[in-house]
């Protein structure tokens, strides 16, 4: 009987214990990935600042990042068996029709090339800002991304926000203004470059949602496509700006530093590539709000590590402005999350009559093209749990929902 009792107790507690153990392992995995993400992000930014302080060629750093992305992603895509992008349909009927959906003929010039140009311009602007101003201040200015997204969504998508969302932007504005006024190493070109990079990231995030939703391309596959196309914008700029400046200056002091500089450029490119992959991995393990909190924490870590390692002079008021802006980003994400949860409750039908009513009042249907759905009249639809990040729009695949739902800026 005692043995039976023990056996029964083991049977009752076994699944719960296994579930608890699995949850602990999952939590440990997320924590380890977050710590690695923070270390790579902070280390990469410090390395970028060290490079640009001694080797003032920001386009070269951006080119190394793009090349690292193009070199590192294809093996990863093959290892993870990420499906290839759908083929582009021709102007007429294909003699060998594809078994899957096709992309429209103007997909690449209309969507991919503008996004690739945005990736190129945002990367160059971001490195110019790190070159001109401290890393801590550049990342504080990046905290203005929610402001840009709200403004651009209002202008482009005619999307209105709730009063709470607008109020949540006040700490971000106040923090950035306070950090700007008290920044001891302020540079106007650095501020303009950081704002331009943030604006470009915001536009990229908005329109990459449409591409991901309409094309059904995997986000890492799209990231690889954008990186390969961005090289064509980057190389001419590198030749005209960095290479020509180096050849004209004929400064041979760089020659003996080349091995060290090349090593730092390789480390910087690897850190940037690894950040993208780890950010994707974390996003697929946690909720959108948890990801936004992790990303805001990452920004705090980058600012803190850069202040400790680079020892740029700051005041207590300056630090207060930085932290206020970062906490404002978290408040914005929390407000958006609450608003989205409330909106989702209203979207769920309670009765059959509610369901029929929703069907009657549905917005214009998406227009099919070669098996894909492309929205009419700008009524864009996107997948759930879209997350705005510093470098690329990652999307957790799920059921379609409206554009205004589940968007978080970090």
UniProtKB/Swiss-Prot annotation:
Positions of transmembrane segments: 50-70, 111-131, 133-153, 165-184, 188-207, 222-242, 252-274, 282-303, 312-332
Annotated GO MF terms: antiporter activity
Entry's Gene Ontology BP terms: transmembrane transport
Disulfide bonds: none
Major localization listed first in the record, in broad terms: membrane
InterPro entries: Sugar_P_trans_dom, TPT_transporter
Keywords recorded for this protein, A-Z: Membrane, Phosphoprotein, Transmembrane, Transmembrane helix, Transport
Name used for this protein in its record: Solute carrier family 35 member E1
Organism from which the protein derives: Homo sapiens (Human)
Lineage of the species this protein comes from: Eukaryota, Metazoa, Chordata, Craniata, Vertebrata
